[in-house]
Amino acid sequence: MYVLNDKCFYFVRQLNDDPIRQHHADPYGFLTCYDLESKTWETPVLVEDSQSRSDFIVFDSNLYLFHAPIDREHIGILKIDTSDLAGSEVLLQANMGSSCFYPFVQYDENHSLCMSYTVDRKHIRLARVDMAKLV
């Protein structure tokens, strides 16, 4: 969950029980927003996602979601259209080369964007993300 101006953005993983693919359920994330002034929910958007952990960050006045779009070896960045969630777009999907759990994104004391994550739930890594090169 992330509050930006008068909106509360909410993202959680859900499972889509697809009757066509009876052998397994397709994972996806449920992205929506609650307007704190009008007290209304926006129409939710489904985002391909494979784990229940994600994190929001604001960069250059834009809202982004870091999550696992394909499997736990991938990290994805979704640029969120704060005025129309359906207009949100995938900015990046990268293979991390090993399992990547619990991404947490924050700015350091030099205002550089950093992401910590665990590898195989055993080791914690810290990476610097140069968002200016990605957007």
Where are these regions (language model features)?
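Beta-rich carbohydrate-recognition and catalytic domains
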Residues: 1-52, 58-98, 108-112, 118-135
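C-terminal regions of proteins
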Residues: 99-103
